[in-house]
Amino acid sequence: MNVLEGERLEQRRILHEGRPEWTTVDGEELVLMDGRRVVEAEVNYLPPCNPTKILCIHLNFESRRIEFRAPDLVTPTYFQKPITAVNAHRGMLNRPDNCQYLNYEGEVAAIIGRPMKNVAPEDTWNYIAGFAPANDVGAQDFRETDAGGMT
């Protein structure tokens, strides 16, 4: 079964009694896998995974491609972000003191659930563990001088 099959399952990862725990949602409570319940408003969230790498598709919106005056892309290009870029729900975002242009974009993150290499496009869904909302934030002060990076 892949992520597109079966019932929708919303899981959240929290820090509970000093340990990472997976939960499901039941109203205003979160239910741990062992059945214990915690009040959602009182939990500390963790990111939905512990990534080993973060790969981002570059210029995935036509408006961005036009903004950067990039040619039509035959295949997508990508860039990497450090794993320290991952934050959790309700996490703090620190804006550098000298940052004038903080850019943010809503994204959909695909969480890859197992090692994946040379996978045929039609088999991709078998490797995706789920999806999460993501906020791609970047300090754009160096955009003109580092146009190749754009991160």
Regions found by a protein language model. Name each.
Residues M1-T77, I83, G148:
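N-terminal non-catalytic cap/leader segment that marks the start of a structured domain
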